[in-house]
């Protein structure tokens, strides 16, 4: 744990000028290392412990990370239950592209009366939120029938991030990619 804290502190841009120091002899009896941050004078104490052995006789604790299920939302906090049809376009040079999501009879129409208006298009996963305000509704006989949302990717980095979201979303919802 101490090594992790030290690595985080050293890797932080705030503590780029960290200086190792020894504690006074009268402190807790053993040498320790202190990293000082230039941010508000806050210091982080990292006590040295016995080096970890490579072979442990007892089971160690395992860290379990829970990942958020990928979701699409039109109203923040309310997941869209309808699975969309997604079309992708990409420029020849690969620098930009557009994803067009079509939701036929989306569940947001059922809940928008209680929860409020559609505020945008939000794709949420464990990396964060991708969002767009390019959302339009199609009406049939005066009633909302479908929603079309566009997400524009202007850089290869945005394209890669979108593809990571779509991979997670498709795995969670049983979708597959069909190239046409």
Swiss-Prot record:
User: What subcellular compartments does it reside in?
Assistant: Plastid, Chloroplast thylakoid membrane
Region Disordered, as annotated, extends over: 16-39
Does Transcription count among this protein's keywords? no
Gene Ontology cellular component list: chloroplast thylakoid membrane; photosystem II oxygen evolving complex
Record key words, sorted: Chloroplast, Membrane, Photosynthesis, Photosystem II, Plastid, Thylakoid, Transit peptide
Q: Identify its membrane topology class.
A: Peripheral membrane protein
| Matching Pfam families | Psb28 (PF03912)
| GO annotation, biological process | photosynthesis
The transit peptide is at: 1-64
Please name the InterPro entries in this protein's record.
Psb28_c1_sf, PSII_Psb28_class-1
PANTHER family in UniProt: PHOTOSYSTEM II REACTION CENTER PSB28 PROTEIN, CHLOROPLASTIC, PTHR34963
Complex and partners: Part of the photosystem II complex.
Q: Which family does it belong to?
A: Belongs to the Psb28 family.
- Protein name according to UniProt: Photosystem II reaction center PSB28 protein, chloroplastic
